[in-house]
């Protein structure tokens, strides 16, 4: 989906939502913000300063994406949460904090090997909801400044989704959060909602 004639401002520390039909351009717009796609026209700015190719890696290092289609390692829970870190460099207290924020710590405590439980190829030993909570924990471990949740709670039941979004109230305001969702309950606490249609921002408002 091509994004056209669109301009948006996202204040630091805010939580915004991108809503619209499947294929409307929500994910493409989020990928442009993350620098995963480069605009052929227009610019991505930070505090009014355009981000250049030289600055883009530093920007991306401060961003985290929790997609709907999660890719997990055939490794331990601990290694999956601290994805990209050497085993000896993993901070277990930070791992537990990330698991608590994603409402997954109680499940891990109940597992025979705890953090060292192997999850199988792409998390085959976990349920869909558990895989998504683990992916959220990975983002929380990175302490990202910009967090994009692309239908990240779609496989969670209503109570768990509520718990995860409540956890975002505690940790999310330390970063800027962009939520892509279909459920109205998911975007209820967003400061600003952008409706995307056919690659354009059709309307901007809040939940009320």
Where are the model-predicted features located?
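ABC-type nucleotide-binding domain
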Residues: 4-208
